[in-house]
Regions:
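Bacterial Sec-dependent N-terminal signal peptides
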Residues: 1-20, 212-213
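Structural signature of tandem-repeat unit edges
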Residues: 37-45, 62-75, 85-98, 107-121, ...
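Consensus positions within tandem repeat domains that build extended binding/scaffold surfaces
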Residues: 79-80, 100-103, 123-128, 146-148, ...
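Acidic, contiguous N-terminal accessory segments
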Residues: 210-356, 571, 577-581, 714
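Conserved, mostly hydrophobic/aromatic
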Residues: 243, 317, 360, 381, ...
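Feature activates predominantly on carbohydrate-active enzymes
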Residues: 295-515, 531, 564, 672-676
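Active-site neighborhood of glycoside hydrolase catalytic domains
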Residues: 467, 479-592, 599-602, 606-607
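Flexible, acidic glycine-rich loops studded with aromatic residues
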Residues: 577-583, 587-714
């Protein structure tokens, strides 16, 4: 409570605080950074690691007004103010020369920007998604990158002081309502702007470029078979579309109509195209047929045929039909650098997945993900045929799922102050009703939702409310840093099993997936030592005949705890347990799914899976940890020492790990990408960390090795 009282005081102080002037962010205390609302920096600004910009972005979370006019900074770095939602006003450095890509991405309260005279380049997506940006003034003639000012819903005035139009990508102003924007330029230069790429869109004279798509260049993941008939007449996508769907495909028909509306101009209630102009005027009749075909070899298999007058998609199941639609959607989008494609060549796709589980894991415990933002994550997953969303709902830092039997868990353990050096309020949880709705929403996209409740470690949030869960029975505060706690649930205390049983009873009712994840990781050195001295744990070991004293006895005790919970989940709730594999596990309980996650220890985990006749999902850190930076110096610039997981490293993942066909047939469960959120402090940052690596993961999980090519993927 004391921490939240102090936050209220800080917020009150911040609201009345006048602009603070300092040379650099290091001149402010942590508390003043957190409370700052208005700042002026005058020094030479640092741009790497824990730079002035990283501190402005991640530590000064309440910042609304920033004056950098007197600061020395030739280059505003990439992601400088990425998704800083409070920022309203900024004065850029007078001597600025370049604005990096995504520098102000999703700063959705920013109201005005003036680009200084000396700026020569505005990077890709630099101001994309600044929804309340009303006025843009460009004093020089900088080159404007792809989507530099895209998706600005509120922009009303753009003033350019150069008589010669600045060079602009065709997509520089994509997603802007051109009719609602006043473009002001020097007298006598309108003719040049009318003809200039990027700028001509403001005059309503140039149709945005559309083209015949190149299927080989736009499909991710790569399909098993693709045959293009380049000599045949392409399908012109603008026309009067109707969708004909077999029984049982009502959901897929809705998706088909949505895709056609978004990509070709739409359908009205009678299946007629609502788009004005184009082939629709001529009354081109186009049909999309959705059907089931039981002869296909896999439950997710589909065929897609593009004909001159329509599209035929067949699937073994509704899931296969849906994935055919996702492939069609990508064909309509082309390479995504333009508004879309006018035509698709006649072709046939025959496709099915290599693995049947292609998962992403998100972590709302370290930094909470609001419900609507969590929902927004789903369509992009489905677009690339990712089909499992793993929710890490419990950890040392928060308990984020409502448990009606234990209301104190969310009342007291779902909020805290700060995450490492980010002194900000972090709070939120999901109600059971929200999760029921979320599960149903995901099902429409053929994604199943798997909840995770950690045990026996990573449970400090629960322990902070119910100290009787621990060996010493001492209340511990919620953890506000990353790392591993030395607290465990007490294996010798029957309340632990009662508590977990009640939690899983409610989860089993909310989440219909056949899988529940039990955690199980990082309960070893030194944490298991708390079981060594616990009288209850010692008594249980004696009862079980566990007599070894080389610390293996504690792993055996963890095995006992797991055995009891696994038996409960199987017999009462018909669930298949999952857990993170540790090399100290000497057995994998029959029927369970284990995760190979520790970097450098994947082979050991796979061998254990084979020896135990178990299924295993691959998410090794060196390939699949998407919270890690994608390149040196990338976000998160400050972390606990994360290595780099590059796009190439993710793409290079071989789900079979060279173990052969028998392993792939009998043991391989799937692949997963993990998004731990210790250093991810906004929903937009989740997307930044997830993509494009999730695309590489999708191809690794779906596409057969012989069809994959790094050069083709790029």
């Amino acid at each position: 409570m004391r921490k939240f009282i102090s936050f209220a005081v800080l917020a009150l102080m911040a609201s009345s605080m006048s602009a603070q002037t300092v040379a650099n962010m290091k001149d402010l205390s942590a508390e003043k950074k957190s409370a700052a609302v208005s700042l002026k920096l005058t020094g030479t600004l640092t741009t790497t690691r824990n730079s002035d910009f990283r501190q402005l972005r991640d530590l000064a979370w309440q910042l609304r007004d920033l004056d950098l006019s007197e600061a020395t900074c030739p280059v505003l770095p990439k992601n400088a103010f990425h998704s800083r939602h409070h920022l309203q006003h900024i004065i850029l450095p007078n001597q600025l020369q370049e604005i990096g890509s995504q520098a102000f991405f999703a700063c959705d309260n920013l109201q005005e920007v003036v680009i200084p005279q000396g700026v020569t380049k505005v990077g890709a997506a630099a101001f994309s998604g600044c929804k309340k940006l009303k006025t843009i003034t460009i004093n020089g003639a900088p080159e404007l990158g792809e989507f530099a000012f895209a998706n600005l819903e509120g922009v009303k005035l753009i003033k350019v002081n150069s008589k010669i139009p600045p060079k602009a990508a065709a997509t520089a102003f994509s997603g802007i309502n051109m009719r609602g924007v006043k473009l002001v330029m020097p007298k006598g230069s309108e003719k040049l702007y009318r003809k200039a790429a990027g700028w001509n869109a403001f005059f309503g004279e140039v149709k945005q470029a559309r083209e015949v798509c190149n299927p080989e260049a736009c499909l991710i993941p790569t399909p098993m078979e693709l045959e293009v008939n380049a000599k045949a007449t392409p399908l012109q996508v603008a026309g009067n579309w109707k969708v004909v769907a077999a029984d049982g495909l009502a959901n897929e028909q809705e998706h088909a109509e949505r895709i056609l509306k978004e990509r070709t101009g739409g359908l009205d209630a009678y299946g007629k195209n609502a788009r004005k102009g184009g082939n629709a005027k001529q009354g081109s009749e186009l049909t999309m047929t959705l059907a089931l075909d039981e002869s296909l070899p896999d439950k997710e298999a589909y065929t897609l045929e593009i004909q001159q007058k329509g599209v035929v998609i067949k699937g073994k199941t509704a899931t296969g039909v849906f994935y055919g639609l996702m492939t069609f959607d990508q064909l309509l989008r082309g390479d995504a650098s333009k508004i879309g494609c006018d035509a698709i060549p006649q072709l046939v796709v025959k496709d099915q997945p290599r693995t049947h589980v292609r998962e992403l894991m998100v972590d709302p415990c370290r930094i909470f993900i609001p419900y609507e933002d969590l929902k927004a994550f789903v369509p992009e997953m489905a677009r690339y045929k990712l089909n499992m969303l793993h929710l890490h709902l419990v950890d040392d830092q928060a308990w984020t799922i409502e448990i009606k039997k234990y209301p104190r868990l969310t009342a007291e353990a779902s909020s805290r102050w700060g995450m490492d050096d980010m002194l900000m309020p972090i709070k939120g949880y999901y109600t059971q009703e929200q999760m029921r709705d979320f599960v149903a929403y995901c099902a429409k996209y053929h994604i199943q939702v798997v909840p995770e409740i950690e045990m026996p470690g990573h449970e400090v949030a629960a322990i902070s409310v119910y100290p009787e869960l621990t060996c010493k029975g001492v209340r511990k505060p919620i953890r506000t840093t990353c790392g591993v706690s030395d607290e465990l649930l007490c294996a010798g205390n029957e309340f632990t099993y009662e508590f977990l049983g009640n939690v899983f009873k409610e989860l089993a009712d909310v989440f219909p997936s056949e899988y529940i994840h039990l955690g199980g990781d990082e309960a070893g050195n030194p944490a298991l030592d708390c079981w060594t001295t616990c009288p209850k744990c010692q008594a249980l070991k004696k009862k079980l005949g566990i007599t070894s004293t080389d610390r293996s006895e504690n792993w055996k005790l963890q095995g006992y705890l797991f055995d009891r919970i696994i038996d409960l989940l199987r017999t009462q709730y018909h669930k298949t347990p999952m857990f993170w594999y540790e090399t100290d596990f000497k057995k994998i309980q029959p029927g369970c799914v284990t995760f190979a996650w520790r970097a450098g220890l994947t082979k050991e985990a796979l061998v254990a899976a084979v020896e135990n006749n178990a299924r295993i999902l691959l998410c090794p850190g060196e390939h699949c940890y998407f919270d890690y930076p994608m390149a040196k110096g990338d976000m998160p610039e400050v972390n606990w020492g994360m290595p780099v997981t590059s796009l190439k490293a993710t793409y290079d993942l071989d789900p079979a790990w060279g173990m052969g066909e028998d392993f792939e047939k009998n043991n391989l469960f799937g692949v997963a990408g993990t998004l731990w959120s210790e250093c991810i402090n906004s929903p937009e940052r989740i997307y930044y960390q997830a993509y494009p690596r999730s695309l590489a993961l999708a191809e690794a999980g779906w596409s057969f090795q012989k069809n994959r090519s790094w050069e083709g993927f790029l």
